[in-house]
C-alpha cells in the first residue's frame, strides 16, 4: 500500500484501507507513506516512512538518506519523536488552510530535491517483494512519482483507486496558477491511470466519465459492511430536534456544500428549531470555511 498519510483508522484514507484489507495476513501487507506520524491500525505491521523533515535534512546533509523502515510490532513506541510529529502537523495544518499554488509547488520542489530514491527504500522493496501496489489517487504530484519509482523497481501490478475528481480542469475558475496546477495534476493522474493494471472508481458517474476521458476500463469499488443482520433504526421521539451529523474532511470544497446545507437549515429553523447540523472533522478548517459552515441557529 502506498499512502500519503500514515495508515490511521481515524483518518479517511486509513479507515478505507482498513475496510478493504482487514482480515488479510499482516505478513502479506506493507505500507509506504509520506509522513513522520505513527500508524494506527490492526492490519499492517511493515512500514516505510518518508517525512518532509527527512527530505530537508537529505538536501543539506550529503550522506543523509530520507526514509526509514520499521516493524510496528517490534518498534518501541516511545521512539516516535512526538516533537517532530507535532511540528509536522502544524506544517500540514498550514498547508490545508492556505492551499495556495506556490506553497504546493514548494512542496513538490522539496520532493524533487530530497534524496528519497536511496538504498534504504530499495532494500525495503527488495525484502518485501510486493506482487501488487494498491494506491489511492492523490492530488499531489510527488506521490505519483513515488508510485512510478516503486513500480519500476518491483515490476509489481498497480491498482489505482480514484475517489476525488482530479481530471476535471475546465469550468472551475481560479487564478492563472491554479489552472496551470490543475492541468499538471490532471496530466499526472492520467499518466498513473494509464500505467495502472487496474483502475477503480467510487461511483457509476465517475466510472463513465473517467472511461471516456482516459479510454481505459474503470471498475467500481465500494467499502464493505456486514449486511447479514438488518440493523434496527429507532427515532428518538422524546425531542423534536433532528440532528444531521457529518463526519469527515472539509477539504476540496466540501465546506462550501456544508455551508449550503447550513444556510438551508437556517431558513427552515427561522420560526422554530427543527434541524441541527453537527460537523466533525480531524482537520481544523480555515477561518473562511468555518464562517461558512458554522451558522447560528443551524450548525
Protein language model features and the residues they cover:
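Carbohydrate-associated surface elements
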Residues: 205, 223-224
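N-terminal subdomain of nucleotide-sugar transferases
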Residues: 1-78, 218, 226, 263-271
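Conserved nucleotide-sugar donor-binding subdomain of glycosyltransferases
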Residues: 71-132
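Membrane-proximal helix-turn-helix segments that form the acceptor-binding/catalytic region
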Residues: 116-123, 145-153, 166, 179-198
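Short N-terminal targeting/anchoring amphipathic segment
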Residues: 121-143, 157-159
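Active-site proximal beta-strand in glycosyltransferases
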Residues: 132, 136, 148-169
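A short, active-site helix/loop in glycosyltransferases that binds the activated sugar's phosphate group
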Residues: 35-36, 191-218
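Conserved catalytic-core segment of nucleotide-activated headgroup transferases in glycan assembly
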Residues: 226-297
Amino acid at each position: 500500500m502506498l499512502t500519503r498519510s500514515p495508515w490511521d483508522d481515524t483518518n479517511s484514507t486509513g479507515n478505507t484501507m482498513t475496510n478493504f484489507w482487514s482480515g488479510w495476513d499482516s505478513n502479506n501487507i506493507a505500507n509506504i507513506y509520506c509522513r513522520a506520524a505513527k500508524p494506527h491500525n490492526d492490519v499492517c505491521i511493515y512500514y516505510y516512512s518518508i517525512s518532509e523533515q527527512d527530505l530537508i535534512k537529505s538536501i543539506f546533509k550529503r550522506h543523509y538518506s530520507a526514509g526509514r523502515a520499521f516493524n510496528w510490532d517490534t518498534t518501541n513506541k516511545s521512539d516516535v519523536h512526538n516533537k517532530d510529529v507535532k511540528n509536522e502537523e502544524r506544517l500540514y495544518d498550514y498547508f490545508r488552510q492556505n492551499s495556495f499554488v506556490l506553497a504546493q509547488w514548494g512542496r513538490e520542489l522539496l520532493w524533487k530535491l530530497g534524496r528519497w530514491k536511496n538504498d534504504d527504500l530499495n532494500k525495503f522493496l527488495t525484502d518485501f517483494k510486493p506482487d501488487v501496489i494498491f494506491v489511492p489517487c492523490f492530488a499531489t504530484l510527488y506521490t505519483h512519482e513515488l508510485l512510478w519509482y516503486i513500480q519500476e523497481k518491483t515490476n509489481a501490478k498497480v491498482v489505482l483507486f480514484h475517489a476525488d475528481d482530479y481530471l476535471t480542469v475546465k469550468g472551475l475558475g481560479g487564478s492563472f496558477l491554479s489552472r496551470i496546477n490543475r492541468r499538471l495534476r490532471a496530466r499526472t493522474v492520467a499518466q498513473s491511470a494509464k500505467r495502472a493494471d487496474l483502475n477503480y472508481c467510487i461511483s457509476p458517474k465517475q466510472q463513465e466519465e473517467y472511461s471516456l476521458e482516459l479510454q481505459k476500463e474503470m471498475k467500481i469499488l465500494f467499502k464493505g459492511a456486514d449486511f447479514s443482520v438488518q440493523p434496527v433504526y429507532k427515532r428518538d421521539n422524546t425531542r423534536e430536534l433532528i440532528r444531521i451529523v457529518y463526519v469527515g474532511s472539509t477539504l476540496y470544497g466540501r465546506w462550501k456544500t456544508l455551508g449550503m446545507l447550513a444556510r438551508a437549515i437556517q431558513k427552515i429553523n427561522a420560526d422554530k428549531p427543527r434541524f441541527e447540523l453537527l460537523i466533525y472533522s480531524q482537520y481544523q478548517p480555515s477561518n473562511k470555511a468555518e464562517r461558512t459552515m458554522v451558522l447560528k441557529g443551524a450548525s
